Amino acid sequence: APVWIRWFGLLFLTVFPLFPMWGFTMVKDAQYYISLLYFGVSFADILVDGTEKKKWWKQIVFLCASYGMILCRKEGRYLLVCALICLFFYHKKQWKLYLFTAVTGFMILFYIEQIYMPAHDIEEGRLAEGLSAPIQQTARYQRDHGAEVTEEERAILSELFDDYDQMGTAHYSPEISDAAKDQMISHPTKEQLKNYFKVWFAQFCKHPDTYFQAFFNQTYGYFYTDRKDRLGTPIIETTVGREQLSMEEFYMEIGFPPQLKGMREFLIGMIHFVTQFPLISLLYNAGFHGYLLLGYVVYLLGSKKGKRILLIVPTLLVFAVCILSPVNGELRYMLPVMIMLPLNLTWCAYQERESVAEKEEK
């Protein structure tokens, strides 16, 4: 990587206070984006050099990073599957590694979800967590066109949502879907879901503009650079011990060393201070990183070598998950995209160097 990218990466990940501050938190995000970064680095190493040199080291890093992704966040499994499929079709030399990763990853998840969790009475997460976009559209439709909802549609929706008649007024927030999602019953049947999506599609056909407005209200923060981001402050200030909210309310016995209180306060104050500076503040802006990601894609596609975009695929998938997330422009969801910034810049610089070398050879 060019020297300027190395220094930028060092400053971005260590001196700028966002990632050090998240390092103090005790939530799954930090472990997930660290696993993603290691996955990306080992991914790039395989694409460039294969696994001939230091074969065992590269494979172990790739495997550990893959397992970390699927264990820390549910989206990690989908990201890994898509990445492995792309690797298998466009970079087949290490197909045994991809197959081993997929099989062992499946075995780990099968044991945890089908054996360990049932044995310890641990329930799966609510299905509503993955349906933010359609639920928001249903809630907005009820708010704007409630009088047009037929009795049959109301009966189906009331069976799935606890307070459907008040969903659009009392529970709909254009940028946060949590209140609307909470109205969905915990364990809907396949028949209930089938009927719901029939109603959802029928209402979309009647008023598609309402659905588009609901979706854009929920996602514009990932493309709009003039939006003030939340920086994940509520979660950070709770999990670093600044807020009075006790972690015991979440059945977590977590303590905060009083001798580190000053450091925690310093990190929180620094991030709010740094984000006021021009240009630097863009590094803490979800919309800016969305455009950067699109810039990588355009540049790599323009290189006329489609395989070069493979490294960006994991970041693109994370960004797609952000768009479908329950909170608009939430920087916490963008952390995996942001931490890949130095690696993605390095990859583009490497491709430029390779292109120049190829032209000189000709």
Task: Please identify what each model-predicted range represents.
Residues 1-15, 33-34, 53, 57, ...:
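Transmembrane-helix signature of polytopic, membrane-embedded enzymes
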Residues 24-31:
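Short acidic/glycine- and proline-prone juxtamembrane loop motifs at membrane-interface regions
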Residues 6-17, 37, 41, 66, ...:
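Short helix- or helix-capping micro-motifs
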